[in-house]
Design a protein with these regions (language model features):
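N-terminal intrinsically disordered, low-complexity tails of helicases
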Residues: 1-42, 89, 107-111, 117-118, ...
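Residue-level signature of catalytic and energy-coupling elements of molecular machines
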Residues: 16, 28, 45, 61, ...
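Conserved nucleic-acid-binding Ia/Ib motif block in the N-terminal RecA-like helicase ATPase lobe
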Residues: 21, 70-150, 158-161
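Phosphate-binding Walker
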Residues: 26, 54-59, 91, 207
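Walker A/P-loop NTP-binding motif
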Residues: 29-41, 54-78, 100-105, 184-185
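Pre-Walker A (Motif I) flank of P-loop NTPase domains
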Residues: 39-45, 80-84, 135, 192-193
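The conserved Walker
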Residues: 47-51
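Post-DEXD/H (motif II) to motif III coupling segment of the RecA-like Helicase ATP-binding lobe
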Residues: 154-221
């Protein structure tokens, strides 16, 4: 990853080295080049399970947050805001994504916080967690939508990045309606970068692509 020192914060690079992430996988390499280098493009990536899709979206979204917060005084009300929403199909995948994102944030944890809404906690605990405006929220679509409808998860003015991880599973598990509601009911900022990550590109995923993505880079790896 040292070849991407011009794109990634030194603290992120150090954490990658500590966690033995040496050479980027093809999907990570292509995503970094197209989402951070030059014009920040939307990404549609088809890559098999185990190909490194979490870091393929995780590194760009975390880098954008770190870069943004470096220019905001900690005393400002704009400093704490949810800037990335990661939608996943299951609690297990939420745990995996949260763990890997936190690994990358080893040296930035005083600056960037990740909240996992898929964990089975009381609603009062979840409300408190969201009231602190974590930088990244990882959730199933149903949990994210419920939190938005309750007014607890607010990203309309702050969202930089939207991710649907394992899109084919998100849709096959029946979350399609929740995803479309999140997209169409005014919960999101008008301008944000979107990552659709999937092991397969079936008709349902292609339909979601048309709804979500603007001039995307399509990676078939």
């Amino acid at each position: 990853f040292q070849a991407y020192a011009h794109l990634l914060d030194a603290r992120i690079l150090r954490a990658l080295a500590d966690n033995k992430f040496g050479t980027p996988t093809p999907v990570q390499r292509e995503s970094l080049q197209n989402s951070l280098g030059g014009a920040a493009r939307d990404i549609l990536a088809r890559a098999r399970t185990g190909s490194g899709k979490t870091l393929a979206y995780g590194l760009p979204i975390l880098q954008k947050i770190v870069a943004t917060k470096q220019g905001i005084p900690k005393s400002s009300t704009e400093y704490s805001a949810t800037r990335a929403l990661v939608l996943v199909p299951s609690r297990e995948l939420a745990e995996q994504a949260t763990r890997q994102l936190n690994d990358v944030l080893t040296y930035c944890k005083d600056m960037v916080r990740v909240a996992n809404l898929a964990r089975p906690v009381k609603s009062s605990v979840q409300k408190l967690l969201l009231s602190e405006r974590p930088d990244v929220v990882v959730a199933t679509p149903s949990r994210a939508l419920a939190s938005m409808q309750a007014g607890d998860l607010v990203v309309r003015d702050s969202l930089q990045s939207l991710v649907i991880d394992e899109t084919d599973l998100v849709l096959s598990y029946g979350y399609g309606t929740d995803v479309k509601t999140i997209l169409q009911e005014g919960f999101l900022s008008r301008s944000h970068q979107t990552f659709l990550m999937s092991a397969t590109l079936d008709d349902d995923t292609e339909a979601l692509r048309e709804l979500m993505l603007k001039d995307p880079v399509v990676l078939r790896l």
